[in-house]
Amino acid sequence: TMGEETVAELQIPDVDDVVKGVEALDVDAGDDVDEHDADLAPQAAGGAPSSVNMSPADAKVEAVALIDDDRLLQAARLLRRHAVDVPIANPLDATDAKLNAFVPKAAVMEDLIASLKADPKTPGTEWLVQCEHSGRRDVSIYYRMDNETQTKLTARIESPIHKDMLVPFLSVLNESELYKSWLPNWTMPRLRVRRSDKLSQTGRCSQVVLVTVDLPWPFSSRECVLDAWGVDDIDASGDICVLVDSMKPGESMRCGSIVPDVDESGVVRIDFEAGFLFRKLPGGWEAERDAARAAASWFGTSGSSGTSKGGEGANDSRRSSLDEEGHSDDGHHAESSPGDQILVSVQMYMDPKLSYVPTSLLNFVIRTVLYTMWCMLLRVAEQVRDGKSESHQKSIREKSTELYDWVRERTGAMLARLFAGGNVVTA
């Protein structure tokens, strides 16, 4: 069964109005970030001016200010530029302690971003193609298994979305307490999200969430405590990033609270790590998609290509159903110009803490669960965009001043930067 929300109107400002109002940076937004140029971004954003002559002490203070403004990656670049090594061996004050707590996460995020920006089809990457589905929602899924255990899964999912989906998508990700209302559940085999509780709001766009998932018999339920960090790297690279990392019992959250022990007998805590990346659709994406569609049409695979194996009939039917569900959305079309689109990518690693994973369960997760959950996420974001999710509408309204007004302003700056030079297309 899948949770459905009541229909209500949600007023989201027109993206182009936000873009035009921001009048953001008149620069090209490439993927490569010059450390010196990135260092100057705080001045444009209202922070203290940067200087090549800044002392290490001043660099640390400025880095903390950047962290407080959700610009962790810029803080890490600033510290590297001024030769401040983190972790700091002998922290002297609260500034040092904060840098030690936050900055190491930047390296993890940078590695994930580098992986997400690399072509998964490059020889030697070990990615296997699960599906490259072309339709109203373009979805590409890749995966690889740990060679030693064959139980640890790394998956990568990519979809281009229209620019007016950016704020709704981010809001659905942020509203973790509503996950249980829309994430799909299965009875055969049993797989469902039973609990999604926010333990702490640790920052403007950072939180700690407890998620419990029931697995098929004879496996016990699994859960993880997820520390999610939203990072604004718009002024430096044009990107928005989210890092999700599991926490262990007894660890301290950034708010000072302690991660609790498992509160149910038989439930097993697992390891999970993920990174979301929102960036301009790379050049050539459309051509590759069209080529995949042409190949799929030639071989009669109805718009889906990849390593589909036996038993995929039900999955293909489900994919078709998910794809068709969205066609009732008035005023929104399947085709978009590359100048309208943002590429959303996520890479996730999970260790289920199992000595053996049956092939049937593994195939179910790889072939069905990942695709269905991703399409449901896109579908709910579409509902939010169209004002059709009362629960999300209520949360967005309640958090406008503290969060969503800022999200709209920053995403407006991102879109203006990415589509500068008169390439912003009216929605």
For each predicted feature, which ranges?
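Eukaryotic helix-grip
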Residues: 3-427
